[in-house]
Amino acid sequence: EDTIAFFTSLGLLTKARGNYVYPYSDQASTVLDLLKSELDRLHVKITTDVTVTGISPTSHGFTILTDHQKQKADAIILACGGKANSKLGSDGSGYAIAKELGHTMVPVVPALVQLKVKNHPFAKAAGVRTDAVVTAVCHGQPAASDHGELQLTAYGISGIPVFQISRYIAKSLYLKQDAKVNIDFLPAFTEETFFEFLLKRRNGREQMTCADYLLGIFHQKLIPRFLEQARIRMHTLTGDLSDTQIKSLVQVVKNNVVTIDTTNGFDNAQVCAGGISTEEITPDTMESRYVRHLYLAGELLDVDGICGGYNLQWAWATGYLAGTAAANDISSDR
């Protein structure tokens, strides 16, 4: 509510879709333009195309080292972003600066990212989108699960539910642990109800081929993949299917396990998991516990959320706390 109130004060009109809030214009650039307009109104100096190479605390504040010149500052807010999507400007250099100032970094991995599958059984079904539940299984244990539109690609799996569980897979792979994803391609049915459905479909249609057995349920590109994994030939007649074969088909559909080889890289990730340890930050001000008047905010810290605006909210909330605290501290020191 505070975030909405802040942006409303800048002139942003919003609308809600379910539990999510969007600019009424449906343009992300509207938010950026309003922020830039407010900076102009407040006569805030903005310097671009400068690379910060280091920050040195002094007795009166900080010296900022850049590829152009040295600058002085009373306070520093590090809000450099992580390593995700570096073409937008966040190349991970903020981590090095924070480490030089004494902070500890939790290993960083891509998050909200696509997954590459080893010996991909659905490569020939690339382009298919289907409702599914995906579960990250890390080191033999379920870690996270999500339900939504699964996208099959030539190299692996994608889509919002895959993004939601990807951080757990990435962490597991970083630790050299086994990482798999269990896919339920028919979450509307239990194993028992799907088995009964297939039994009824078999009875009375004994001359139907297995190529047509799953028509009306799944995308045509998925059917041969399922049958292949269940070791059922496409031209087999349904009347020749045993109950054991049907149970095998049910398992392929309801508990399809793929092994993850790796994630896509940071440039394909929406955010990072990992970053500067939050234990080294005062939570109500975002000030460093090690360096006075140094503040850290946003994705630079070891906090990441699922899709749905949570990472944006973290950036805005911590930025607000850091900015307010920095201004108050500087004013009180003068």
Please tell me what each predicted stretch does.
Residues T47-T48, P224-D304:
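A glycine-rich dinucleotide-binding beta-alpha-beta segment and adjacent secondary-structure elements
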